[in-house]
Amino acid sequence: MKEGIHPKYNEIIVKCLCGNSFESRSTKAEISTEVCSQCHPFYTGKQKLMDTAGRVERFRKRYNIAAAPEES
């Protein structure tokens, strides 16, 4: 590797909005993240329900698409 052309690779602290922090390595001075393994719903087991039904209905209404018949 050539000398002097690569960025410095430092040990940093990554901070999450939930207050959790951990050490990592990066070329950046610091990293802030919105979610981490301590607060992400997949890891905590707390699932958030998304309002996708309202979005689908709004899409169908906007483009005049009839709802598909339900299979019985």
From Swiss-Prot:
Species assigned in the record: Geobacter sp. (strain M21)
How it assembles, according to the record, is:
Part of the 50S ribosomal subunit.
What gene, per UniProt, encodes this protein? Answer: rpmE
Question: Is Amino-acid biosynthesis among this UniProt entry's keywords?
Answer: no
Under the heading HAMAP family, the entry gives:
Ribosomal_bL31_1
- Quote the record's binding site residues for Zn(2+): C16, C18, C36, C39
Q: Name one GO molecular function term.
A: metal ion binding
**GO cellular component, as recorded:** ribonucleoprotein complex; ribosome
Q: Fetch the InterPro entries from UniProt.
A: Ribosomal_bL28/bL31-like_sf, Ribosomal_bL31, Ribosomal_bL31_A, Ribosomal_bL31_sf
- What family does this chain come from, according to its entry? Belongs to the bacterial ribosomal protein bL31 family. Type A subfamily.
Alphabetized UniProt keyword annotations:
Metal-binding, Ribonucleoprotein, Ribosomal protein, RNA-binding, rRNA-binding, Zinc
- Give the note describing cofactor binding and stoichiometry: Binds 1 zinc ion per subunit.
Top-rank taxon, per record? Bacteria
The free-text function statement in the UniProt record for this protein reads: Binds the 23S rRNA.
The Swiss-Prot or TrEMBL record lists the needed cofactor(s) as: Zn(2+)
Keyword RNA-binding tagged: yes
Q: Which GO terms describe its biological process?
A: translation
Q: What is this protein called?
A: Large ribosomal subunit protein bL31
